Amino acid sequence: MKVILLQDVKGLGKKGEVVNASDGYARNFLFPKKLAAEATQGNVKTLNEQKTSQELKKQQEVEEAKELAKKIENSPIEIIAKAGDGGRLFGSVTSKDLAETLEKQHHIKIDKRKITLPEPIRELGVRHVEIKLHVGVVGKLTVNIKEA
């Protein structure tokens, strides 16, 4: 019997796949536990429509992320911090500071967890910081740290 899996089933397949299952296994286990639905023409058509709408949604998210990456690359930020001799900062500039400054200066809201900063910035100067906006979409933010 052909069934459409509504959830991942170990040993059978992943969610959204149309697979063959024995009649008894489908009727006695998969259907009662809502793990699968019978693969009728209507159900298969609905599944295909859902897959296409999900793909369109993913493409739209990627396009929005690419636009945001371009906007970020054209929006350098400037942070003024207290520094001592040799250009070392008192304290440091973290991803949280970068996210807040980006929102204040350019009205671009980014989650601080998306900012890739291996270690906090502790020196004056210009830095290039990567921001992971989506899978495969990375924006480069230019940060200029000046002395107060």
Swiss-Prot record:
Q: What InterPro entries does the entry give? A: Ribosomal_bL9, Ribosomal_bL9/RNase_H1_N, Ribosomal_bL9_bac/chp, Ribosomal_bL9_C, Ribosomal_bL9_C_sf, Ribosomal_bL9_N, Ribosomal_bL9_N_sf
What does the UniProt keyword field contain? Answer: Ribonucleoprotein, Ribosomal protein, RNA-binding, rRNA-binding
GO cellular-component terms in the record?
ribonucleoprotein complex; ribosome
Instruction: Name one matching Pfam family.
Output: Ribosomal_L9_N
Which Gene Ontology BP annotations are present? translation
Organism domain of life:
Bacteria
Q: Name one GO molecular function term.
A: rRNA binding
Q: What protein family is recorded?
A: Belongs to the bacterial ribosomal protein bL9 family.
Question: What PANTHER family does this protein map onto?
Answer: 50S RIBOSOMAL PROTEIN L9
What does it do? Binds to the 23S rRNA.
Kindly provide the name given to this protein in its UniProt entry.
Answer: Large ribosomal subunit protein bL9
User: Which species is the source of this protein?
Assistant: Alkaliphilus oremlandii (strain OhILAs)
